[in-house]
Amino acid sequence: MKLSARSCASIFAVAALSTIGLLGQAQGSRSPKQIALTEDGFPYVRGEYLVKVRSSAALERLLDNQFETAGAVSRKVPVLNSKSGTWYKINLADDHKLRDAILSARESADVIYAEPNYIYHTTSQNEKNIPMPGKGGKGGPDYKEAPTLPVPPVADPQISGMYGLSKIGAQQAWQITSGSSKVLVADIDTGVDYNHQDLINNMWRNPAEVAGDGIDNDANGYIDDIVGWDFRDKDARPFDDNSHGSHTSGTIAATGGNGIGVSGVAQQASIMALRFLGGSQGSGSLEDAIKAIDYATENGAQIMSNSWGGGGYSQAMFDAISRANDKGILFVAAAGNSGTDNDSKPQYPASYQLPNVLTVAATDSADKLASFSCYGVKAVHLAAPGVKILSTTPGDKYASLSGTSMAAPHVTGAAVLLKTAYPKMKAKELKAVLMDSVEQLGALEGKVSTGGRLNISKAFAISKAMFGESESGN
């Protein structure tokens, strides 16, 4: 039996989770065929794997080989992302044949690499304690118009409860700049309550798209993508059904000076909402993560915030983050919450050794490493406040959460401020300045490569010495 490319054109998502014990290849140039399949038990989407082949003809040969050597029936083979090369997702009728199918694919001269469609999850400690919003995910609410902000600015009433801002020197940095809507930051997460009273003014509005006309006006492959995209449910309303993504977005850039609620580290920004995680567990697939990263890369994001992890090493994800690096985009990643050493037990995407990846551990209000936080003197770069962090949640609400998920957005917000003041800074410069300017802490010595916690006030002092006066401000 042979499947043609035409007969394999549709997509079929499978949500069931399992474990396969397939570990992706190690980093660097090693061939995946040299890496043994282990029993580490990473979760994956049942019956699915991703494969990169040399040509469409190679895909046909691979499918034929799957029937003969793995005894598996390939049902659907869609292109994963036409702009990222010949990546395909293969669905097998029998999940028990997945291990054999990947092994046989890796032995084929037509295959560059093959890996399971891993599952990822949020890196917050306690989303379960926050009530789930009643309406989210597929079919989220219509976009509302942003209200006019008060002039002059009015103090945010809950800002006194945000110890993280004072720890990192945010108020001092605001004397230079509070951010700018010109800085586009992609929050890749569970979606965002894009109508939240403290977020609506800082949501990205795709200038090349007309809302609700059913036309892909900007020809980017996504119809009516006004504030971003929902890759989990495949629609234009990336509304948060978990609370996690709204919380991380609020830490990055809740509107400052509107007299409501809280403030982000950056009081102004443009937040691109990219949802690939969802549900009460805040989970999503490798396939959708790659699509979200590529969307951000191709649609103008300058910084990406990533408070999620899980799964084994993925060459597909490594390549996607590399494409972002090629465009100078900073990729901020949460270190993970297992309390383990990322140098010896890598967490992904935090442990990808790429120039644009900046990995963040969590500290508490006493500047101690959080008990749950992953660390690593090589793999983790710096720390930021991540315990009992107050921020936005769906439905115009607020809550305190803990996790490296909460630490990473502090660094993202700091990067927004630097990018506002020094627009020519790319990922390499942003990463270097944020690392070189940390507040040295004894509790972090030997735990993160810099030995310190984020200090945006010092980052501006270093930037001034390196690049001169800022180019923009309040």
What are these regions (language model features)?
Residues 50-52, 89, 113-115, 184-187, ...:
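Structural recognition of the beta-strand scaffold that forms the well-ordered cores
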Residues 30, 81-82, 107-184, 192-203, ...:
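Protease zymogen maturation seam
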Residues 329, 347-420, 424, 428-432, ...:
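Extracellular S/T/G-rich loop segment that most often corresponds to the catalytic His/Ser-adjacent loop
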Residues 171-285, 302, 325, 354-356, ...:
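Subtilisin-like serine protease catalytic core
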Residues 27-138, 172, 181, 301, ...:
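Inhibitory N-terminal propeptides of secreted protease zymogens
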Residues 11-20:
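Bacterial N-terminal signal peptides
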Residues 263, 292, 297-308, 315-316, ...:
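C-terminal subdomain of the subtilisin-like protease fold in secreted/lumenal serine endopeptidases
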Residues 1-12:
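Bacterial N-terminal signal peptides that target proteins for export
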